[in-house]
């Protein structure tokens, strides 16, 4: 029967001390190589932190009233800083801006703006044919009758051409323009370009941006001065009211840049007959801020469809393009004044579909035709004044000159004088009132005032948090190792087979039966080499 003998081996104290010393030296060496391997505690960190008051509130030392007061002071200062920081952040997120005005130095030459004018009456009564009256009945309110005064119910007219009707029946500038001068030089109807608006056939002076006329001086006599006959005898009689019925007499005028199409039915101003109207202009160059400070449209954000038919983006061009898309989608045609090559709407579609579509469109931020302002814009500020004309002497003179009576002169003649107040332009620029650099500066001032901190202090706190977190993760990831032997003090318990395998000495006998004489206590054999090493076997 096999016998298992368990022995206890006790090493001499002289053998253990050098090993402990060696292990201690190795541990000291590792500690010198990798200092701070274990994270610092909060008290140690607080005593070395540059955050004011943290060392006195959380540092090493006894807990007492003094430390409590310091902790309250630290928390109060921290709360005050957070309150101020929240207010600064809210102010920054509102994106405030201011407007700076910089008057420019006088220039020797200034580009004269484009001047668009329209007679308020769209169709001349004498120029309307029977077919025109028939097709325009819904627009003009005139009853469709033939030349004998009978209703033209059974007549068949050719399909109307709205462009031809407007071009043929609109007021002709050659008949209205009685005199024209620009900067002391004579001008004529040939210096005007035909343009179509909601008022029909209109005319624009100085329309071409490639050959813009210059103005070399400010004040009256250095701009455009024209005398017009509005031809009130050609105004349509009112039989019934329609959307196109007008009770006014005079012209509509808009002063704009050459890159901007006229939007005269909303942006124009009226000029009455019997008056000389003075319009003093001031060029204004406006610069708006894009998102998030404003809502202007930058040139880099423009898309090709938004510029279709125009050389540059403008609010007027955007509105006209949007209105055309709406009318085209609902009425399957476009109005004469809209850009594009699509089919022109006939007169009956004007009143039945197109006008209602335009009336339903809104231009507000929530409307389908909201057009943001371009970030760079040139506009012209206006100051308007007027005097009554003609006086008694000039009324008789003009009546003889144009073969009219004085009453006709007073009711139909007007003078328009457009000029620069001075050859200077105003630069108005939106600027961010509170930017990121100002926010950081204010936050730094509040941090220094309340808690005495800086960016480096925040880095210290983040570094300590990282150090503690990393140590916790290492402890979680570390797996415990199962030891091969269980040691208590200097005593180890081994089985006989382990003793045979781990002993550096060869076996001297067999463990069978009673053959155990070779396993004797150490003092029964000759002592080992000198040096104080003793091995005691307890079996």
Swiss-Prot record:
GO molecular function, one term: ligand-gated sodium channel activity
Tissues expressed in: Expressed in pituitary gland. Weakly expressed in brain, vestibular system and organ of Corti.
Motif (GAS motif): 452-454
Cellular component GO terms held in the UniProt record: plasma membrane
Highest taxon in the source lineage: Eukaryota
GO biological process terms, semicolon-separated: behavioral fear response; sodium ion transmembrane transport
Family matches, as InterPro entries: ENaC, ENaC_CS
Region called Disordered, residue ranges: 501-531
Location in the cell: Cell membrane
Record topology, Extracellular segments: 90-438
Complexes and interactors: Homotrimer. Heterotrimer; with other ASIC proteins producing functional channels.
Protein name: Acid-sensing ion channel 4
């Amino acid at each position: 029967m096999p016998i298992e003998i368990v022995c206890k081996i006790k090493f001499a104290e002289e053998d253990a001390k050098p090993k402990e010393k060696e292990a201690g030296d190795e541990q000291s060496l590792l500690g010198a190589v990798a200092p701070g391997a274990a994270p610092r505690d909060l008290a140690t960190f607080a005593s070395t932190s540059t955050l004011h008051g943290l060392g006195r509130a959380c540092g090493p030392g006894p807990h007492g009233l003094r430390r409590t007061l310091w902790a309250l002071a630290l928390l109060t200062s921290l709360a005050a800083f957070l309150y101020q920081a929240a207010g600064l952040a809210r102010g920054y997120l509102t994106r405030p801006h201011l407007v700076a005005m910089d008057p420019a130095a006088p220039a020797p030459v200034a580009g004269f703006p484009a001047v668009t004018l329209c007679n308020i009456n769209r169709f001349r009564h004498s120029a309307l044919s029977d077919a025109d009256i028939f097709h325009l009945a819904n627009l003009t309110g005139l009853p469709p009758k033939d030349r004998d005064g009978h209703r033209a119910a059974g007549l068949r007219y050719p399909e109307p051409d709205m462009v031809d009707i407007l071009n043929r029946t609109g007021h002709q500038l050659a008949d209205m323009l009685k005199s024209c001068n620009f900067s002391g030089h004579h001008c004529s109807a040939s210096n005007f370009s035909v343009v179509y608006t909601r008022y029909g056939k209109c005319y624009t002076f100085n329309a071409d941006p490639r050959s813009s006329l210059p103005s070399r001086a400010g004040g009256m006599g250095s701009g455009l001065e024209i005398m017009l006959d509005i031809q009130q005898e050609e105004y349509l009689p009112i039989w019934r009211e329609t959307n196109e019925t007008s009770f006014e007499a005079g012209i509509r005028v808009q002063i704009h840049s050459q890159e901007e199409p006229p939007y005269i039915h909303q942006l124009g101003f009226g000029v009455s007959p019997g008056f000389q109207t003075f319009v003093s202009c001031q060029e204004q160059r406006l610069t708006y801020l894009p998102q998030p400070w404003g809502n202007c449209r930058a040139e880099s954000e423009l898309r090709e469809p938004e510029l279709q038919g125009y050389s540059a983006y403008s609010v007027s061009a955007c509105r006209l393009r949007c209105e055309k898309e709406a009318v085209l989608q609902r009425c399957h045609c476009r109005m004469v004044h809209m850009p594009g090559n699509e089919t022109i709407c006939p007169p009956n579609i004007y009143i039945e579909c197109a006008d209602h579509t335009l009336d339903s469109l809104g231009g507000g931020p929530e409307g389908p035709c909201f057009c943001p302002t371009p970030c760079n814009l040139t506009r012209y500020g206006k100051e308007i004044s007027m005097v009554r004309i003609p006086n008694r002497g000039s009324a008789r003179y003009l009546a003889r000159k144009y073969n009219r009576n004085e009453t006709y002169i007073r009711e139909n003649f007007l003078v328009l004088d457009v000029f620069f107040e001075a050859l200077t332009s105003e630069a108005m620029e939106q600027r961010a009132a509170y930017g990121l650099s100002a926010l950081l500066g204010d936050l730094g001032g509040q941090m220094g005032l309340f808690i005495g901190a800086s960016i480096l202090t925040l880095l210290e706190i983040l570094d300590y948090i990282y150090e503690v977190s990393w140590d916790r993760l290492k402890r979680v990831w570390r797996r415990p190792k199962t030891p091969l032997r269980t040691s208590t003090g200097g005593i180890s318990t081994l089985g006989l087979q382990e003793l045979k395998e781990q002993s550096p000495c060869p076996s001297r006998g067999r463990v069978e039966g009673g053959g155990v004489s070779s396993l004797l206590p150490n003092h029964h054999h000759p002592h080992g080499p000198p040096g104080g090493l003793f091995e005691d076997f307890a079996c």
